Amino acid sequence: KAKGKLDDFVITDEINACTIEIEVDVEGEKQDWYLLFKNETHNHPTEIEPFGGASTCVGGAIRDPLSGRAFVYQAMRVTGSADPRERIEDTLEGKLPQKKITKTAAKGYASYGNQIGLATSQIAEVYDPGYKAKRMEVGYVAGAVPKDWVRREAPLPGDRVIMVGGKTGRDGVGGASGSSKVQDETSINSLSAEVQKGDAVEERKIQRLFRKPEVTRLIKKCNDFGAGGVSVAIGEIADSLNINLDKLPTKYAGLNGTELAISES
């Protein structure tokens, strides 16, 4: 991009996934499509809550091209671990055993991918002593959508913001800043709640909804609901908004305003 060699690169203020314009042969007819790419690292979440961290690694990666109205059809997973055969008593204080992280993370990733129906065509796990200090969990996805299914316009006063997805809970509160905190031997006892509980079935419903051009063409601007919750996902939609947090559907009663505003779930 810096060298001006990406003539097909799509520039938009919807900064969700890298997008390029391509020509696709659809049963002999040439059509203009968008091809979207996204990768996501979930090193910290997977280390403290392996199942949820790995499952939301792929789920979170899907969200970005999906918010670009694309159908995500392919994935890749690259992970890094210390020797999973290491003796339990050699586990670093405040860490989960390498075997526990590796096996549980694999189950978490597979669980989400199977439920949403996403093919992961490349998987590689790298073993190195350096990953004992910090796990590596990288997910990558690709998606595509016909160009004429996507409408991009600036929001105007009077436009409505519609949230689509699961209900809000305390899981996912603090996830945006969690990986930047100072960690110690006790962190694992309290930080796992920062990892959002994934909902593959709900996300699959959104994928199916977005396969209808009569739906996608209604959308002026779309954003994925990531770390930082409402305050980020909706805050990035326009320069000035009125947000009524009481309107948010919740998993249970008792959430305060801050939790409603920043929960990733």
Task: List where the protein language model places each region.
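Glycine/proline-enriched, intrinsically flexible loops and inter-domain linkers
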Residues: K1-S265
